[in-house]
Amino acid sequence: MSTSTEIDAPLAAAPAPVGGSRRRGQLSRRLSLLLIAPLILLLGWTFFLPITRLLLTSFTEPVFGFSNYERLWTEPLYLQVFIRTLWIASACTVFALILGYPVAMLMARHGGKFAIFATMCVLIPLWTSVLVRSYAWVIVLERNGLINSWLMARGLISQPLKLLYTNGAVLMAMTHVLLPFMVLPIATALKSVPPDLPKAALNLGASRLRVFWSVTLPLSLPGVFAGCLIVFVMALGFYVTPALLGGPRTLMLATLIGQQAIELLNWPFAGAISLVLLVLSLGITVTFKRLLKLDRVVAHD
């Protein structure tokens, strides 16, 4: 009996062959590369190759050098467009956060039919075309639109206000369009917060405001950072809404690129603006990523 046990023990403890696991790992990696190869080729042919060619054009035409970039930074009109884009994107992110955080808290704290209803209210606008939603704002803000008609009917104004083709119109519409992209990440982060933590803080005598600032908000910061990053980067390159509600007097970087490429056929200058927008978006993404890592380190400590 003891002899059989002594013989079986080394056999049971024998390690699995290493060569077989390595082969399986190599086959798995090769299969993964084979599966994503068509996607890489498609992206390379339809995205990276045209972008690379456009960026090279910005350095080589009309003459080799940085003339297109110097024009972007030296002419007041284009510098104003750059500043306006940053301002509207920042304001849109702030307003989306202020409006979206309470909605995300309601979605995370309430279950059942209310949570389903709130989620549908957030998701349904995403299923509607951005063009349709932007045209809806045109109807609301135009000279004979809903707001001016309501104000004039009550005698609050004597003549229609100029609401359309302004920075405010672009900001309101972009906040409305991008709001779901702020709500969903924050709601996901809030749902991951253990419900016992706020309850424990309340039982220890903390006020609801103190619980929010000390417990709920810090634990939801990953969702806040993710939502702010998505909204800000999308706002930087937004085209449809600024083109419809801003007009030629409220240009942003994306609409300026469209104007230079489609109307003026100035592809080198459009490529220069595109590179600036791309570098700006990548820089902001890297910054938010580092902030998120720092926040996780602080939370862990």
Question: What are the language-model segments listed below?
Answer:
Residues 36-45, 94, 120, 124, ...:
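Transmembrane alpha-helices
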Residues 2-18, 187-202, 271-301:
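C-terminal transmembrane helix and the adjacent membrane-cytosol boundary/short C-terminal tail
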Residues 29, 33, 56-94, 159-160, ...:
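Periplasmic/extracellular loop-to-transmembrane helix junction in inner-membrane transport proteins
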Residues 8, 13, 20-31, 69-78, ...:
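Interhelical loop and adjacent transmembrane-helix boundary motif
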Residues 21-25, 66, 134-175, 209, ...:
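Membrane-interfacial helix termini and adjacent extracytoplasmic/periplasmic loops
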Residues 13-53, 116, 120:
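N-terminal signal-anchor/first transmembrane alpha helix
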Residues 40-80, 140, 144-145, 150, ...:
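Short membrane-interfacial helix/loop motifs at transmembrane-helix boundaries
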Residues 91-123, 139, 191, 196-198, ...:
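Transmembrane-helix boundary motif in ABC transporter permease subunits
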